[in-house]
Amino acid sequence: MMKNTIDNEKKWKVLSSEYLFRRPWLTARKDVVQLPDGRVNPEYYILEYPDWVNVIALTKDGRMILGRQYRPGLGNTCYEIPCGVIEEGETPLEAAKRELLEETGYAGGDWREWMTLSPNPSTSTNLTHSFLVTGVEKISGQHLDATEDIEVSLHPQEYVLELLQNNQILQALMAAPLWKYFYGLK
């Protein structure tokens, strides 16, 4: 087993924090921080987000479930794996199961925690928890949030790998667990 290399040896000291704005999905703050060598940075900006989940979901016949939806940050419609925010009081697994059902109508199967990533450890406080589930079945229609418009489709795994290799799955926090899946790090 690999030794844990993440530690607090060079931890910065937060001298003060000022919240610039707070919204349900994003909070921004300005910290005054002291570095280990004693230098002070009077303006270090941190984005506080809730933790997220995403799901690599395979049907009983081995096809992958993808969604396509418009993403305003890129100004494009993108392929994605099911994903969403962990609601207060939920575990990552509970959130992953809920998001898969809400976005696709699929449920069940054998669930496995796949990987956990930081979107940007330099400026963001949250983590993304990825799951792999095999053997899911369609049990209902979608139950989308007001701003969601997700086109769900099932694809052979080879096609999803081709999408990934050709930069058609752009979200890094979705691409990383897919690369892990396809390159045998199961």
Where would I find each of the regions flagged by the language model?
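Hydrophobic residues on conserved beta-strands that form the core of alpha/beta folds
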Residues: 14, 28, 41-43, 67, ...
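Unchanged
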Residues: 42, 52-54, 59, 85-173
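A glycine-rich, hydrophobic loop/mini-helix early in the fold
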Residues: 49-76, 80
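Extreme N-terminal tail/first-helix region
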Residues: 1-22
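Charged phosphate-binding loop/patch that engages nucleotide di/tri-phosphates or the phosphate backbone
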Residues: 174-186
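Acidic, metal-coordinating catalytic segment for phosphate/diphosphate chemistry
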Residues: 16-54, 60
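Short beta-strand micro-motifs in enzyme catalytic cores
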Residues: 27-31, 77, 127-129, 151
